[in-house]
Amino acid sequence: MGSADERRFEVLRAIVADFVATQEPIGSKSLVERHNLGVSSATVRNDMAVLEAEGYITQPHTSSGRVPTEKGYREFVDRLEDVKPLSSAERRAIQSFLESGVDLDDVLRRAVRLLAQLTRQVAVVQYPTLSTSTVRHLEVIALTPARLLMVVITDSGRVDQRIVELGDVIDDHQLAQLREILGQALEGKKLSAASVAVADLASQLGGAGGLGDAVGRAATVLLESLVEHTEERLLLGGTANLTRNAADFGGSLRSILEALEEQVVVLRLLAAQQEAGKVTVRIGHETASEQMVGTSMVSTAYGTAHTVYGGMGVVGPTRMDYPGTIASVAAVALYIGDVLGAR
């Protein structure tokens, strides 16, 4: 790229930075005063004219200044060289806050609250998707000789408890056998494979009497746990931050709030996050949703080195501190994965 193009990008970068900070359209005079661009105000005016002709900035009808367009923000994000690093104190605080979570629900609630505070945007965290979860442990506890409590724990920390009513009583030896049979069928398997395994057990042993009947009944109940609750869930935090930026959305704030409440659009965008550590920025129409026009979404996946648990990120106006937001989303995702993976 030639020097004139590089200079114009520096002008664009300055316009984005100032507009994000001030919410006011930016003129050439203020750019020269605030930034060491090394050229005259006349040159900056010419560069702004070129940027406007190429669709990177535009002039609000009520102002003599310019503001970035979606195309301008995209160019700015694509050419980001430095993402604002979090301080070591901030990183330690994030890690400590998340590690204090008592279970999966608490960790994710803490994460969404923390991300909303860090970015001053709406934070969204998807519950771990069942399709990628692995059964870490199955516990079977006798409440009575004919009534069992089964607890399924996944690698992401998801816990599901089910009661099994047996047709007959079983003794401690049979309980140990039942626990071993079910554990071998489930533990270490992806939930999709585990559901097939218990379905086979249920069909083979259901109604066989004694231990076989107990295994069949338990497998049938487990199948409900593994298969029936596949709906995706989303946690939201900081929704009030949208109203703080209401002027950025024009008249579309209501439709944005409705999209967040319905969750379908956000879950679709988060479902595309398949790689932990990679942050995706969607600006304006890139969300492919009319309800989300005027917003940007910065998102990533969280999980371990080998397993993606779900997606997370923030939704806010296109007038967003992209370097700071990208850093915050990446950091919180990293620590969620570490905390859940260590449990």
Swiss-Prot record:
The keyword Transcription applies. GO terms for molecular function: DNA binding. One of its GO terms (cellular component) is plasma membrane. Keywords: Repressor, Stress response, Transcription, Transcription regulation. Transmembrane segments: none annotated. Pfam families: HrcA. Belongs to the HrcA family. HAMAP family: HrcA. Negative regulator of class I heat shock genes (grpE-dnaK-dnaJ and groELS operons). Prevents heat-shock induction of these operons. Was identified as a high-confidence drug target. This is Heat-inducible transcription repressor HrcA. The gene is hrcA.
